[in-house]
Every structure is written in structure tokens, then in C-alpha cells.
From Swiss-Prot:
Disulfide cysteine pairs (residue numbers): none
TM stretches of this protein: none
Chief place of localization: cytoplasm
Location relative to the cell: Cytoplasm; Nucleus
CDD domains xrefs: TenA_E_At3g16990-like
One Gene Ontology MF term: catalytic activity
Cellular component terms (Gene Ontology): cytosol; nucleus
Keywords from the UniProt entry: Cytoplasm, Nucleus
Annotated PANTHER family: BIFUNCTIONAL TH2 PROTEIN, SI:CH1073-67J19.1-RELATED
Name of the protein this chain belongs to: Uncharacterized protein C530.07c
């Protein structure tokens, strides 16, 4: 991990939780050591597509909150705005790759092209029924419950999204570096190479650097721990049924 991310995780006191969420779930460990059952990866891709739909709304809500918060670092806001703007092209690449690999995808509306539109048109209740229980509960937290926690502010919403990215990148970098995975899973590697690429790691680093001087609260720590737990469980949707 980059030094900025290491510093934040240490400050939050969640070093062990992050590593467990990223590399200790049965799904990620199974991919890395060659014991994941057939079909698990494709099953997880289906759930991941649903989660991205929900996470885009979380990002839109976070942007909306941060834009109204005096003194929040402009660099952090700009990174969030950039993150929202790349969702559509990223999904186009992802869905094209899934089609090439005969991966079933859920029937979803396009992600709204602007975060302002997402606040109006992205309705998680329209796709809850498509998702596995742990995916649904994660989306509910990221799009609704997170923003209802008393006393929270922009740094808490930023942290929720940021840690999601940290764990995601750490997990797939871990899988990508596995010799067993490299040998046994050439088709899956095409997805994993995309997620583990250096540019994604740089994005995570930039997010961390942008909030180095923003103070955390006890709510920030609690939310960070919740995200670690949700991420660990979300990887297990590879073994669930919607």
C-alpha cells in the first residue's frame, strides 16, 4: 500500500480489519490458492455490477454533501467528481469483457451520467431483488444508512468510499500476484489485471493524500470498521444466490 493509505489506516486503527477484508475472505483466498469452486468468479461479477450501481449513488450523495461543506479539501472533491465521471466508460469496458466471457449480467438501467441526475434517478429499491443478501445490505448501508448516522460529515462519506477502493485494490492485487491464479485462471486474469493496474493504485493514493490533514471522529472510525466488515461479506456473494 502507498504511504498515505498506510498512515490513514494506522490512524484509524484498522490495519488488521483491512487486511482481513481484502485477503482473508474464502472467495479471495480461494482464487489465490486455486480452491475457489467453478462459477464463483462469474457469480461475483454479477453481484459486483449491482453493487457498482448502488455505489454510484453513494458517490453522488457524498459529492452533494461535500459541495455544501465549507473547508473540505478541493482536491478530495475533484477526485470524487472525476471518479463519478469515469463510471460510465469503466462499466462499458467491464460489460464488454463480460459479454466476451459469457458472464451473465443483471438487467439494470444505465448509471446516470451526472451525479446530480443520480440523486433523482438512481433508486436502489428497483434492483434490490436482483442481489444476494450481503450485496443488498451493503448497498443499503452505502446509499441510505451511512447518511442517516447522527453527527456525520463529508469526511465520513469520503472515508466509506475510499476504504471500499482501498480494499478492492488490495484484494485484486493480492490475487493477481498469486502464481496459482496466474497459472490456472487466464480468463479471470483479464478482469483482475484491469483492477490491479497501477493507475488504480495511484487513484487510491491520491484519495488518501487529499485528506491527510482532515481530522477524524469516533464516527469515522466506526464507519471504517463497518466498511471492512461489509467488504469481507460482499466477497462471499460469490457463493450466494439472489
Amino acid at each position: 500500500m502507498d504511504p498515505y493509505t498506510v498512515a490513514i489506516i494506522k490512524k484509524l486503527g484498522i490495519e488488521e480489519q483491512v487486511e482481513t477484508a481484502a485477503t482473508k475472505s474464502p472467495f479471495i483466498e480461494g482464487l489465490a490458492n486455486g480452491t475457489a469452486p467453478p462459477g464463483a468468479f462469474k457469480r461475483w461479477l454479477y453481484e459486483d455490477r449491482i453493487y457498482v450501481q448502488g455505489c454510484s449513488l453513494c458517490l453522488a450523495k457524498a459529492i452533494n454533501a461535500i459541495t455544501h461543506e465549507k473547508g473540505f479539501p478541493k482536491e478530495a472533491l475533484d477526485l470524487f467528481l472525476g471518479a463519478y465521471n469515469v463510471i460510465t466508460p469503466e462499466l462499458a469496458h467491464f460489460e464488454a469483457r463480460c459479454k466476451e466471457s459469457n458472464v451473465e449480467m443483471p438487467k439494470l438501467k444505465p448509471v446516470p451520467t451526472s451525479w446530480e441526475q443520480a440523486l433523482q434517478d438512481n433508486k436502489p429499491e428497483e434492483y434490490y431483488h436482483l442481489s444476494a443478501p450481503d450485496c443488498k445490505s451493503y448497498i443499503q448501508f452505502m446509499t441510505q444508512e451511512l447518511f442517516e448516522i447522527p453527527g456525520t460529515s463529508g469526511i465520513d462519506y469520503f472515508m466509506a468510499f475510499y476504504l471500499n477502493e482501498v480494499i478492492y485494490h488490495r484484494a485484486w492485487k493480492f490475487v493477481r500476484e498469486s502464481k496459482q491464479f496466474q497459472k490456472n485462471c487466464p480468463e479471470e486474469m483479464e478482469f483482475v489485471k484491469w483492477w490491479g493496474q497501477p493507475s488504480f493504485g495511484k487513484f487510491v493514493e491520491n484519495l488518501a493524500r487529499s485528506i491527510q490533514d482532515v481530522p477524524f471522529t469516533s464516527a469515522t472510525v466506526d464507519i471504517a470498521k463497518k466498511i471492512c466488515n461489509f467488504e469481507y461479506r460482499f466477497f462471499s456473494t460469490a457463493f450466494e444466490k439472489a
